Amino acid sequence: MSSKLVLVLNCGSSSLKFAIIDAVNGEEHLSGLAECFHLPEARLKWKMDGAKHEAALGAGAAHSEALNYIVNTILAQKPELSAQLTAIGHRIVHGGEKFTASAVINDEVLQGIKDSVPFAPLHNPAHLIGIAEALKSFPKLADKNVAVFDTAFHQTMPEESYLYALPYSLYRDHSVRRYGAHGTSHFYVTQEAAKALNKPVEEVNLITCHLGNGGSVTAVRNGKCVDTSMGLTPLEGLVMGTRSGDIDPAIIFHLHDSLGMSVDQINKMLTKESGLLGLTEVTSDCRYVEDNYESKADAKRAMDVFCHRLAKYIGAYSALMDGRLDAVIFTGGIGENAGMVRELTLNKLGLLGFEIDHERNMAARFGKSGAITKDGSRLALVIPTNEELVIAQDASRLTA
C-alpha cells in the first residue's frame, strides 16, 4: 500500500464529510458522512472495503463524537490505515484576502480563518471545531494539518471583478469585496479540461459551472480565475437549492419596511427558503424539477428561472475571454447529472455557437465525463469534480 494516505475533513455546521485518500493514485480507502448533529438522530454512514455501514452517534452528538467514532471504532478495525496517514486536509470555505493558496495550519492560519468568520458564519466556526478535534484525535499529525481554501483559486481576480460599486472605504477598511466559492472544484475541472483539450493549463479559456445545492460560475482566462458569480458570501449569483442568488438589494428594504420582516427572517428566507425551494414551494431538489418539468407548473417555473440565470452568466463571462472560449464545463451534482439543465441552458446560447448532442448529453451522467455538444459545435464538457482529491494532494505536497 502507498504511504501517501491523507484524511480529508469537510466540517459543516451540522455535518462532517470524511475520506481517506491516496494522494498519489486517487484511490479512496474510506469515505463517509456524519450528519444530523445536535439532533436526536445524529448518525454516521461510511463505506470501507466496498461495504456500507451505518451507526447512531447518540442524541445531540456533534463533531467531537463523530471524530471519536471514526478514530476509535472505524479506524480501530484497520489500524494499518491510521498508521499510514501522512497528513490531514481540511476544506475551508472562506479564507478572506489573506490566503491565495493552501497552507499548513499554525496559529496564524487559525487566526486568518477566525477573521473570515463574518463572511462564512455557518462554515468557518465548524471548520475551526474540526481542526481542534483533529489535533486532539491525531496528535502525531499535529504539524501535518493543511487548510485548503474554497476562496483561494479566485484570488487572481482583477480589481474590476472583485470590487463592488460601494464606497471604497468599505473595501479598504472592512474587506467588503467579491471572494467567490467552490474554488477547489473550479481549479480541479480547469486542470482536467486542459488535459482533455491537450493544452497547457495556462493557455485554456473556460467558463466552469459548478452546480450543486450551491452553485457558481467562474470565468477562467489563461488558466486563472478572472471573475466568479458568488460574492462576499455564497449567496450571490445563480439560483441555488435554497438560496436566491442575485436579487435587487432594495427587495430587502421592501420586505423590512412594507412587510414587517425582521433582518433575521429576511436572512433565513434568502439563504434557506428561496432558490428552487422558493420557486417550486415544494423542494430544493433539482431531480423533482427535471422529472416534473413537462407536467407541473411549479417545476417548469423553477427550471426556467434556473437555466435563464445560468445562461446569462455564461453569456456575460464570454465577454471576458479575449475572443477565445475553448469550452464550457459542467460539474457538481446537478452539473454532472441533470441533462435537462445543460440542454435548456446551452439551447439559449446559440449565438456562442453551442449545439447540444442529445445522445451525448444523456450519456454523460452518473459519473461519466465527456463532450455533450455536436462535432463542429463550440465545445461543452461534463467533468465530474473531485474536491477531496485536490485537498489530499495539497495536504500531501505541503507536508512532504
Curated annotation (Swiss-Prot):
Molecular function, one GO term: ATP binding
A single GO cellular-component term on record: cytosol
Cofactor binding note from Swiss-Prot or TrEMBL: Mg(2+). Can also accept Mn(2+).
SUPFAM superfamilies, sorted: Actin-like ATPase domain
Cofactor needs: Mg(2+); Mn(2+)
Keywords assigned by UniProt, alphabetized: ATP-binding, Cytoplasm, Kinase, Magnesium, Metal-binding, Nucleotide-binding, Transferase
One BP term from GO: acetate metabolic process
Catalytic activity: acetate + ATP = acetyl phosphate + ADP
Organism: Serratia proteamaculans (strain 568)
Catalytic site positions: D150 (proton donor/acceptor)
Enzyme Commission identifier(s): 2.7.2.1
Residues bound to substrate: R91
Binding site for ATP: K17, H210, L211, G212, N213, G214, D285, C286, R287, G333, I334, G335, E336, N337
PROSITE patterns named among the record's database cross-references: ACETATE_KINASE_1, ACETATE_KINASE_2
Chief location category: cytoplasm
Lineage: Bacteria, Pseudomonadati, Pseudomonadota, Gammaproteobacteria, Enterobacterales
Known pathway: Metabolic intermediate biosynthesis; acetyl-CoA biosynthesis; acetyl-CoA from acetate: step 1/2
Pfam families, sorted: Acetate_kinase
Subunit structure: Homodimer.
Positions contributing to Mg(2+) binding: N10, E387
Site (Transition state stabilizer): H182, R243
Protein name as it appears in the record: Acetate kinase
Family classification: Belongs to the acetokinase family.
